[in-house]
């Protein structure tokens, strides 16, 4: 429940996985305000550094995976905050237009004033001469996730654009969010949108990265036609 969450919450993240067969581990620490929808994270690669691929493909598993820090307007039930103290999980498949695929599973739990994230990722089929494996990407454009409930699961569908020089590499994201609480204990939100701006203000030698995200959940601003 939202009462367990404070205006300032800490974050700890533990990530491991492979991308095109390269094994790595990352650890992150950060903080944010769950009620204003802003968060920051500082991430170190603890194994497998320097990464031989663009960290940009992992960034959405960190911040865009940190769904407690989404500002929900008053009329939208907050699925994620309702899920505490038990927490929630999500699974995501990201398909890039050049054939690369990234799958991820994340577990979110709460320990005192700290949110704990455990993330496992698997990246396959990224072209050796593509921008991901050549580390030629330059961050993400802002995007909007379409969110809706289905059989007790919150589904997210998104199209993201990775900046590559003067062009964009497009990818499609399919996410399933599952509360650890029984569905009957939740008030599920209706169809809505989540606007996301994910940035990387700083990185160092492909082994240290700083991320910032702002996100807000909203209904459509467009009025319905009167009868």
Curated annotation (Swiss-Prot):
Biotechnology: Fluorescent proteins have become a useful and ubiquitous tool for making chimeric proteins, where they function as a fluorescent protein tag. Typically they tolerate N- and C-terminal fusion to a broad variety of proteins. They have been expressed in most known cell types and are used as a noninvasive fluorescent marker in living cells and organisms. They enable a wide range of applications where they have functioned as a cell lineage tracer, reporter of gene expression, or as a measure of protein-protein interactions.
GO-annotated biological processes: bioluminescence
Keyword entries, A-Z: Chromophore, Luminescence, Photoprotein
Family annotation (Gene3D superfamilies): Green fluorescent protein
Alphabetical list of InterPro entries matching this protein: GFP, GFP-related
Residues with 2,3-didehydrotyrosine modification: 64
Cross-link (2-iminomethyl-5-imidazolinone (Glu-Gly)): 63-65
Family note: Belongs to the GFP family.
Function (record text): Non-fluorescent pigment protein that is lilac in color.
Additional remark text: In the wild-type form, the chromophore matures at 20 degrees Celsius. Mutants have been selected to mature at 37 degrees Celsius to make them suitable for use in vivo and cell culture.
Subunit: Homotetramer.
Name under which the protein is recorded: GFP-like non-fluorescent chromoprotein
């Amino acid at each position: 429940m939202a009462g367990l969450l404070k205006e300032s919450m800490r974050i700890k993240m533990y990530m491991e996985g492979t991308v095109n067969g390269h094994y790595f581990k990352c650890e992150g620490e950060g903080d944010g305000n769950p009620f204003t929808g802003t968060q920051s994270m500082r991430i170190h690669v603890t194994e497998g550094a320097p990464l031989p691929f663009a960290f940009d493909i992992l960034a959405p598993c960190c911040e865009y995976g940190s769904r407690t820090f989404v500002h929900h307007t008053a009329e939208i039930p907050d699925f994620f905050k309702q899920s505490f103290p038990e927490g929630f999980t999500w699974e995501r498949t990201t398909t890039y237009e050049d054939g690369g695929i990234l799958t991820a599973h994340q577990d979110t739990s709460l320990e005192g004033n700290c949110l704990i994230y455990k993330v496992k990722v698997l990246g396959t089929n990224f072209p050796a001469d593509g921008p991901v494996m050549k580390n030629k990407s330059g961050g993400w454009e802002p995007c909007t996730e379409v969110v809706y409930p289905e059989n007790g699961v919150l589904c997210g569908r998104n199209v993201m654009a990775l900046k590559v020089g003067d062009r964009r590499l497009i990818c499609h994201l399919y996410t399933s969010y599952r509360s650890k609480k029984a569905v009957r204990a939740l008030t599920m939100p209706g169809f809505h949108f989540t606007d996301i701006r994910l940035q990387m203000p700083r990185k160092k030698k492909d082994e240290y990265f700083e991320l910032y995200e702002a996100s807000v959940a909203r209904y459509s601003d467009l009025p319905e036609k009167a009868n």
